[in-house]
């Protein structure tokens, strides 16, 4: 019966987070999503010495359960994959909570008239990301994992995403060093502009009107920032957050992942544009969070 799955006297899945559910069956046992991330980390994120850094953002009420499972399983996977895991945890910050809405999309209030707050979405974890001591960070949903028979594709594409990121970041850093030196020609600035437009997909219509000094300010602003490369999959059902060219407040056009909540669904043209999207991002990102000076 379904109650045997979610009730306390059964598997208690109704009270457990997705990361702790029994997820994939193997000949030698069953793995949770958390364990699958241990395996993935060993396959594509191990350093030269075999060290694998994995960070989980979890809810306060479930943290002890995650820590207990890691303590029970980490030795097993270290022995199996020749890895040395460094597992850390953080919790979504209450300061990122957002106002809950009712069925009419109006702020929800409790019986005392106080606004009810709820945890924000994935974007609220950006502070947790920024707190990490790392150069490159792979970001995934806890349950966005596949069984071993499908992991080869996962590993290949993770390496591809990271390779694209490192290649773009290396070039951006070289250009920033050039701009810092003060020794550059207008032709070199045009080369940097082409990189920003063609590789980073960021455009500005009035660039030809800018003097070189203003061009440098603009280029430095676009290059000296965190960088991310996002994996996309084809839409086969309801469209999710996908890649769009967005108009920014500073007059530039850049590639962004837009969710349905960011689209004016009352505008037929914009709604149709969103619904015709061919790809979406299943929270599969690789991010570079240090600047060109290592900060």
Language model feature labels by segment:
Residues 2-6:
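Short, small-residue-biased leader/transition segments that mark boundaries at the very start
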Residues 30-33, 42-46, 62, 107-179:
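Extended, domain-scale alpha-helical bundle/helix-rich regions
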Residues 30-52, 71-77:
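Histidine-anchored nucleotide/phosphate-binding helix
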Residues 51-56, 84-88, 114, 134-138, ...:
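Beta-sheet entry/capping signal
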Residues 58-65, 89-102:
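Short, conserved secondary-structure transition motifs
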Residues 65-67, 97-99, 127-128, 137-140, ...:
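Short helix/loop capping segments that flank catalytic or ligand/cofactor-binding pockets
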Residues 140-141, 149-238, 244, 250:
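Long, K/E/R/D-enriched contiguous segments that form extended
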Residues 207-217, 225-294:
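Beta-strand-dominated extracellular/periplasmic modules and repeats
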């Amino acid at each position: 019966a379904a109650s045997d799955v979610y009730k306390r006297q059964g598997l208690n899945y109704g009270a457990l987070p997705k990361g702790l559910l029994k997820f994939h069956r193997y000949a030698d046992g069953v793995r949770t999503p958390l364990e699958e991330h241990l395996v993935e980390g060993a396959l594509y994120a191990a350093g030269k010495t075999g060290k694998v850094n994995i960070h989980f953002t979890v809810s306060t009420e479930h943290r002890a359960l995650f820590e207990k499972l890691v303590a029970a399983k980490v030795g097993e996977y270290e022995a199996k994959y020749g890895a040395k895991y460094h597992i850390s945890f953080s919790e979504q910050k209450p300061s990122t909570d957002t106002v809950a809405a009712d069925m009419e999309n109006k702020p929800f209030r409790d019986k005392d008239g106080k606004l009810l707050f709820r945890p924000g979405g994935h974007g609220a974890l950006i502070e947790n990301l920024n707190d990490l001591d790392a150069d490159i960070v792979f970001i995934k949903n806890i349950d966005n994992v596949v069984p071993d028979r499908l992991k080869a594709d996962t590993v290949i594409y993770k390496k591809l995403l990271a390779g694209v990121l490192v290649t773009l970041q290396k070039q951006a850093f070289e250009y920033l060093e050039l701009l810092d030196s003060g020794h550059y020609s207008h032709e070199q600035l045009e080369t940097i502009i082409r990189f920003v437009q063609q590789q980073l997909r960021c455009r500005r219509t009035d660039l030809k009107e800018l003097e070189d000094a203003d061009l440098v300010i603009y280029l430095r602003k676009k290059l000296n920032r965190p960088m991310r490369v996002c994996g996309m999959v084809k839409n086969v059902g309801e469209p999710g957050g996908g890649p769009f060219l967005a108009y920014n407040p500073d007059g530039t056009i850049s590639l962004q992942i837009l969710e349905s909540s960011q689209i004016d669904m009352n505008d037929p043209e914009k709604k149709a544009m969103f619904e015709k999207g061919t790809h979406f991002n299943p929270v599969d990102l690789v991010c570079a969070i240090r600047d060109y000076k290592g900060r």
